[in-house]
C-alpha cells in the first residue's frame, strides 16, 4: 500500500517519559482526577504514581509521533513495558480519542500490540468516518443473547463510552481499574461500555500472503446496569467492552474471519470500504 514503516524501539518511551516536566504531569493528573467517572486505586497495581507514569508515557508517544512525523502508529508494549514500566492503555486510549487533558486534537490511530494490519484498517476507517476507531479482541460469544463481547485490555478510545466528541459526555462513564495479573507493571485499564448504535466492522488480513478485507455490519447494544455488569465480569471487568450483535450468523463469521482483532466505527460504511478495497486491488468480503 506504499506505506513507509518506522521501527522505533519502545525503550524510547521510557527515555522520553523521564524528560516530561512534572508540572505537565500534575496538570494532566488533575484533569483526569476531575473528569474520569471513578479511579479505583488499590495501592498496588494502580496508584497515583503509576497513573502519572502512564501520563508521562503519553507525552513520550506524542514526542515520538511528532519527531518521526507518524501518520499512525502502534505500540508493542508486551511484555517489556507491561512487565517493567507500565501499560500503554491510557496512552493508546487518548491518542485514539479526539481530546485529552491538553484539549481537542485530531484522533491519532494507535494500535495496541503494534498490530500493523489493525493500524492500516483503522487509518482507512478514520479517513472515511472522521471519528475515532474501535480496536477490540473478538473475545467471547454469548449464545443465549446472540451477542459478541468485543474486549481489549484498554485500547478503546473513551469516545465510545458516549459516542461524543465532548469529553464531558464520555468521561463520567469511564472507570480506571487496576491492571490484572497479565500486566505486572500495573497502571490503569480504561474501562467503559460502548454506546449503543449501528456500526460497521472491518479488518485487513491475509490469505496465502494476499491481502483481503473482511467487512460486516452490526450494532452495539446494552442492557440494564446489573446485566451489563454480570456480562462484563464473565471476561474481564477492568477492560473496555463492546456488546455487539453482528448482521451475520456465527457460523458464517467463524468460517472465514481470520483474526482475533476487529475494528469499527459508528454508521454504515460498507460501500465506501468496498470502494477502498477496489482502489487497493484487493478482495472485499462482505458478511451477511
State the predicted function of each range:
Residues 1-13, 153-157, 167-168, 173, ...:
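Solvent-exposed, charged interface segments at domain starts and junctions
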Residues 1-131:
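Conserved, well-structured core segments that form the ligand-binding/active-site neighborhood
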Residues 5, 133-135, 284-286:
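Short secondary-structure junctions
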Residues 27-30, 94-98, 156-159, 227, ...:
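Short, surface-exposed linear patches
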Residues 78-80, 140, 165, 269-270:
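Short, glycine-/Ser/Thr-/acidic-enriched flexible segments
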Residues 110-116, 120-227:
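Long, charge-rich C-terminal accessory regions
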Residues 178-288:
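Extended hydrophobic packing segments that form well-structured cores
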Amino acid at each position: 500500500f506504499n506505506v513507509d514503516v518506522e521501527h522505533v524501539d519502545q525503550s524510547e518511551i521510557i527515555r522520553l517519559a523521564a524528560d516530561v516536566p512534572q508540572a505537565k504531569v500534575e496538570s494532566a493528573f488533575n484533569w483526569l482526577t476531575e473528569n474520569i467517572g471513578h479511579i479505583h486505586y488499590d495501592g498496588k497495581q494502580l496508584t497515583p504514581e503509576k497513573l502519572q507514569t502512564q501520563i508521562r508515557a503519553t507525552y513520550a508517544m506524542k514526542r515520538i509521533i511528532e519527531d518521526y512525523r507518524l501518520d499512525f502508529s502502534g505500540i508493542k508494549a508486551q511484555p517489556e513495558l507491561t512487565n517493567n514500566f507500565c501499560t500503554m492503555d491510557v496512552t493508546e486510549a487518548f491518542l485514539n480519542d479526539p481530546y485529552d487533558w491538553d484539549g481537542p486534537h485530531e484522533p491519532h490511530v494507535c494500535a495496541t500490540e503494534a498490530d500493523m494490519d489493525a493500524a492500516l484498517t483503522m487509518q482507512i476507517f478514520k479517513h472515511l468516518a472522521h471519528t475515532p476507531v474501535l480496536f477490540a479482541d473478538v473475545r467471547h460469544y454469548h449464545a443465549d443473547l446472540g451477542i459478541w463481547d468485543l474486549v481489549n485490555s484498554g485500547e478503546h478510545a473513551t469516545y465510545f463510552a458516549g459516542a461524543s466528541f465532548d469529553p464531558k459526555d464520555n468521561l463520567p462513564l469511564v472507570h480506571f481499574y487496576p491492571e490484572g495479573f497479565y500486566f505486572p507493571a500495573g497502571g490503569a485499564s480504561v474501562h467503559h461500555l460502548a454506546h449503543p448504535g449501528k456500526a460497521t466492522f472491518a479488518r485487513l488480513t491475509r490469505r496465502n500472503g494476499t491481502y483481503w478485507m473482511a467487512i460486516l455490519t452490526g450494532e452495539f447494544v446494552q442492557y440494564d446496569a446489573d446485566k451489563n455488569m454480570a456480562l462484563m465480569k464473565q471476561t474481564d471487568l477492568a477492560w473496555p467492552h463492546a456488546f455487539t450483535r453482528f448482521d451475520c450468523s456465527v457460523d458464517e463469521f467463524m468460517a472465514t474471519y481470520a483474526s482475533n482483532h476487529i475494528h469499527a466505527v459508528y454508521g454504515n460504511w460498507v460501500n465506501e470500504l468496498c470502494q477502498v478495497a477496489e482502489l487497493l486491488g484487493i478482495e472485499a468480503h462482505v458478511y451477511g
